[in-house]
Amino acid sequence: MPESSLFITFAFSRELAIIMQYFTSSLPNGLRVLFIPSTSPVVYCGYQIAVGSRNEAQGEEGLAHFCEHVTFKGTQKRRSWNIINCLESVGGDLNAFTNKEDTVYYAAVLKEHMPRAIDLLADIVFHSTYPQREIDKEVEVICDEIESYNDSPSELIYDEFENMIFRGHPLGHNILGTAHNVRSFTTADAQRFTSQFYRPQNAVFFIHGNVKFERVLRLLEKATSDLPTTAAPVCTPLTPLNNQTEKRIVDRHTHQAHVITGCKGYAAGSKQRMALYIINNMLGGTGMNARLNVSLRERRGLVYTVESSMVSYGDTGLWCTYLGCDNHDVQRCLRLVRRELNLLMERPLTERQLLAAKKQIKGQIGIARDNRESLTLDMGKSFLHEGQPRDVDDLLCRVDRVTADDILTVAREVFNPEAMSTLIYE
């Protein structure tokens, strides 16, 4: 039995008092395991694999997402129907998603069905056969998914904007790929791609529930004992990110204009990231009291939706604002957005403003961590990429360390007008 490590974190602040316990271990084949105990009868578990659309070679855009879909279509011992029915027949749930750096397969079941979930997940992740007859059907499902995005300008504009920012870089292309690419993929393509990246040393297994960790490890060893111990191949070094900005207007014949303006942000491990996280929440976070919402919607009635967002990757990031408005209000809205950015660049936050921003962030973190599925996925992701689960204690400490000077410095660096790109759908 592999050795395991116990971690207990205590997170205290004026708003929150949280105790979190988790265990980690590694199997002989290199699979890392994260266990978060709870008192709930529901178990969340799955695999987080370090492969996404940024790992695709030129000409195979969409292959990572394609593999995620067809992984459910048959293994050496299960047909597609058996995979679907295995957990759903006992009220469980089986799901998956792909992003630019990860592919995740996960399940939710009552704890008495945990062995069934562990066996099924290992089977589909590591032993899928990708039968061509099933691929031929699933291809059309994926193409319909692609078309649904093309029919939604408020979603499509994010993909096109990211392609502008990361032009010529694997992070720039759409996760779904194109219908042309998807229709060209075969069983051999899926087998080649997954054999490269779906390996124990390139993944973590996470589980959250009222179960015995020793039993989890025994079940995992049994389910993965036949897997190779070789590491996933090192990706070809990526081309340097371009630093060009762009202003682009696209005629989409939409009823309203869709507008995104933004720039590169910070990588996941950047010390400046938390300051930008606080700034982003102040500007266009989920609260109705966000500065952009107050300025553009509450005071002037120019928009229904205005928001800002940020995403961090291993080596870079992205920050942007999005809004939808009447075509004749586009330039006015952009000026108002710019005014809010300038205020953050020119005026340091007062102590009261900074404390209020931190209080809001801490409350949001506490509520988000009450969602056990979200908590488990987030801790699994940080365990995969950072080598240690990112817990509440760490997040709260990072929030507390941010100063008004940090906010001012980051705002001046990120919101430089010369670094901004803009994309408009009319």
Region annotations inferred by a language model:
Residues Q21, S26, I83-A232, L238, ...:
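Charge-rich, well-structured scaffold segments of protease-associated domains
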Residues H65, H69, H169, H258:
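Histidine-centered active-site/metal-ligand motif
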Residues A17-R32, P37:
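Non-catalytic terminal extensions that flank enzyme cores
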Residues G30, P37-L87, F161, K271-L283, ...:
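Active/ligand-binding-proximal structured segments within catalytic/core domains
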Residues P37-P41, G46-Q48, A231-N289:
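His/Glu-based metal-binding/catalytic segments typifying zinc-dependent metallopeptidases
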Residues L6-I19:
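Short, Lys/Arg-enriched N-terminal segments with co-localized hydrophobic residues
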